[in-house]
Amino acid sequence: NIQNKHFCDIWLKTLEPFGIQPRSNKYDLFITQNQEKFAKNFLSKYLNKKIIGINIEGAIKEKKIDFTQLKKILEGLFNLNKNIQIIILSSPKRYKYINDQVSDLGLKYVASSYLTETILDAAALIKQMDLVISPDTSIVHIASAFNIPIISIHENNLKSHTLFAPKSDHSITVFSKFSDKLEGYNVGKIIQNSIELLEKNES
């Protein structure tokens, strides 16, 4: 019975006919020492700050945080915790556009990530973060591999969420109003839940 199971558990069940028993259903993701060093060097200027990564776009164009909502989230987070640095993540193809948009915001506590040419470059950066906010499940899974606290934004579809939910020890999902698109989610919940996860991680 695969009802109400996460997709990783469904795939692991395919090993049963071969007599293979998985030791864990946690993700593994391997990055190079150079990738990790580069990420640490990039973040070193934000020493003692809580690092929040926000991925604003997904592989599916409907799964995104628009810049009006993003600005509300950014300002709301900073109003509640001044000791943060927010890094905006983007795909290589969208890097220049998003970097320009972030620059136009003029917020000192917000910066674009460096150009991540591969998904493992992005993973190395995510590994160093204290919290990740994302509407895209691929970034959620990367953060889960390193047990980074996660705020995921998901369409109001519990079956889909069960399949692709975060697997970090600490995660909260904010749902949209619709089952097929990310519209009408509560920005205030994203802000408040983010601060709660940061505080929980400190304790």
Regions found by a protein language model. Name each.
Residues 1-203:
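Catalytic machinery of carbohydrate-active enzymes
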